[in-house]
Each structure stands twice: as structure tokens, then as C-alpha cells.
Amino acid sequence: MKKFTLEEFLDLLKKYNVEEIEGVKIEGDLEIEFEGSSIDLSAIAPLYSMLSEFGNFLYHANMALGYLQRLSAALGIPTPFAAQPQLAPAAPAAPAEVPAVEELKIPAELVRAKFEPYKEEYPGKIEEVVLGATKADGGTREYTVTLGGERSLAFYTFDAPQPHLPAIAIDVFDRRPMLAKAVRMHYEDVLDNPAEWARKCVKKFGADLVTLHLISTDPLLDDTPASEAVKVLEDVLQAVKCPIIVGGSGNKEKDPEVLEKAAEVAEGERIMLASATLDMDWERIANAAKKYGHVVLSWTQMDINNQKTLNRYLLKRVEMPRDSIVMDPTTAALGYGLDYAFTNMERIRISGLKGDTDLNFPISSGTTNAWGAREAWMVDSPIEEDTPWGPRELRGPIWEIITGLTLSLAGVDLFMMMHPVAVAVLKEVFNTLGGKVSGGVADPGEWIFMEV
């Protein structure tokens, strides 16, 4: 390898009259010698600038030498520089080998896995309340009706079994009441005989219980003395052997006396006294139920806080047994009323299941209130521009059915009803939802042609 100084290199370019070089590449080592033993660092900055200019010069000189080599070779003039070897273009890289993929084989049988559906478990349980007493229990009823016992929401049998399906009681009155025509037509022959009325409800219409309303005791009606009114209760107890519910007239002053007398007359039969409310002498009614071994109905007006308060009074002040309390949060049957009733009952049931011991009692519904809505019993709409309502003979019972079905989904355990068709339909629905009816529609696509 030949060494030459920068001055020698410039003289060489002048020798061949090279004023500008382009496309020339110069390769080699650059040596810089410093004279003396010490280096002035302040000289490094201009040295760096000079080297930068020299590097730029070398770039252009390299291009010029390449031009000279090509020109000398064409003219046959020898040059002191060896020609730079031309590098052969790199061979293309061989394609990477792709690993072989095994053929996807579809299994003849899918992997079996057991599906475990999620189950909602609640810490609480609804109290079980038995209505009626058989001979073994000191009464004369042929059977008893048990309410409550749920550990899940209504008909959520996939979460927990529903030990007792909702029961249905049919209303009976101790005097001829004002009834919608669609209801009255089924009881016309027994309206003046409460005992026969009760027998018809059980034998013909399949009532689980009978609710006897002693409305004749109302001071604004017959003002029947309590001692006289309870004779009707005795007749009904003889006529039917199902559990009995006894109600008054709704008079705040008279009802405690009437229900107290009824509790005494029906001692041992475990009837339900309907009802104790915050605006009447609830303590007297509850004490009568406790003394004679009966159940008390705790009634409030769509207020969960009042329901908790009344239940707490019955438990703490009267020391009522927990298996002797049933709640009635009130049933409304139209528009917002039904919405409020459902929401209130649902809140009560969920609170009970979550462990609220002031609310974990069975729920009763006065479903007969459905007939209080004019849409259930009027011949047609009073508004001229309104569309026809349809025959009230069908509309009325459907109204009662919808009311009962809606509230059953909120958790109601006991329904007090009137129309026999509504009773039959709800019984069928409860048995179906509760898994008591086996089988189903052979061809679900033909459901529209089924006869009911």
C-alpha cells in the first residue's frame, strides 16, 4: 500500500489537470502527526473543521479518480492507482423453508362437557305459615294449606325448589254484596246463604280456602253485633272442611271486636284474622290470634317501611310467633296502581330472601280488587270516541287473571279471588310454572290453533 501526503495528492491531481472529481471512492487510513510532546486542546476545534472540509474533498476526489481510471483505461495510459475490483451483485437469498402443517382432522365425536347453570343463592328464607288444623292438630279441617318456604324468587325452580305453590281463596260474604254482573251470575243461587256459598266455592270452583267477610257488622250497613256475626263463621266451619280466613267490614272501631270474637269461636281451627293495620287496634287483634292459636294478616297500604314497622310491632310487642304472620301490602289493579303493587311486593320478597327478618313472611293479595276498576265491569267505555272494550263477561275475568298473574311473579303466596274462571286459569298457570304439569304442546308451531 502506497502512502502519500495530502500535498503529494494535490500535486498528483494538478499533474493530470484535474479540476473537479465526481463519483470517485477513496479508501485508506488517515494518519495525523503532531509535533512536540504537548497538545493544545484549543486547536482541536479548527482541526475538526479542517478535517470536515478534507472529508468533503476526499469524497469528490474519490469520484474524480474513478473518472480518471475509466479514461486511462480507454486511452491505454497506465495509472499509479490499482483499479477497484467490481463486486459481483449479491445472490438472492434462498426462500425460507415453510414448515409443513399437519392436516386438520375433524374429530368424530365432540368433547363432552357438563353444563352447570348458575344458581342464585339467597341467605334468607321465607317463613312457612300453616293455615288450618286437622284432627291431629286439634282442629276439624280435612287438610291444611302451607304458605311460604321459598329460598328463591317466584317460580325460579332452576335456583331452588318452590316447596308450596300459591294458594287461592274465594271470597264469601255474610250478606248480599254489590257484585259485578259477570261475577254475580255464578253465585246467584247462594248469595243469601254464606254456608252454601262457601260449599260451592270449594266443591264446584276448586277453592283451596274460603275467605269469609263479615261486612254486615259495618255500622253503616246492618251493624250486626260481633256475637251474632260469628254464628255465620260457625256455619261455614261446618259446611266446608278447608282452612278459613275471616275478615271484618273495614271499620276501624268495630273490626277489632269482631275479629277477637271470631278468634274465640274458631279456637283450634287455626284461621287467619284479616286484618291488623296500623290505623286500628292491631294489638288487640294480634293478641286474640296469639291467644287462640291463629294467624294474623299484617295489612299496610303499599309502603314497605310501614310493613316493616307493623311486622316489628307484632313480633316485639305482641311476641307473635314467626310462623303466624302473613303480609298484605295491598293490591291495586289498574295502571300505575298495579305497577306500584308489583314493585312493592317484589321489594318485600327480595328483602326477605336477602335476610331481612322483618319482611321474610308469606304475602297475600286481595286480587278481587281487580273488579274495582271500571274497565273490568262496565258495559263499554263512557268515552264516545273510544274503541269498543269487548264483552265484559270475558274482559272482567281476564282483568282478574292479569292482576293475579302479575303479582304471582312478584312472590305472592295467597290470592283472594272471586271469578271461578279466573281461579281455574291461575291454578293451571301456577301448576305449569311450578312444574306440576307434565308434557307440552306436541307441535309448538300450531299453538295458535289450540283450544283452551
Curated annotation (Swiss-Prot):
Gene3D superfamilies: Dihydropteroate synthase-like
Example GO biological process: one-carbon metabolic process
Domain of life: Archaea
Pfam families: CdhD
Summary of the function given for this chain in its UniProt record: Part of a complex that catalyzes the reversible cleavage of acetyl-CoA, allowing autotrophic growth from CO(2). Probably maintains the overall quaternary structure of the ACDS complex.
Subunit and partners: Heterodimer of delta and gamma chains. The ACDS complex is made up of alpha, epsilon, beta, gamma and delta chains with a probable stoichiometry of (alpha(2)epsilon(2))(4)-beta(8)-(gamma(1)delta(1))(8).
Family the UniProt entry places it in: Belongs to the CdhD family.
Name of the protein this chain belongs to: Acetyl-CoA decarbonylase/synthase complex subunit delta
Gene that produces this protein: cdhD
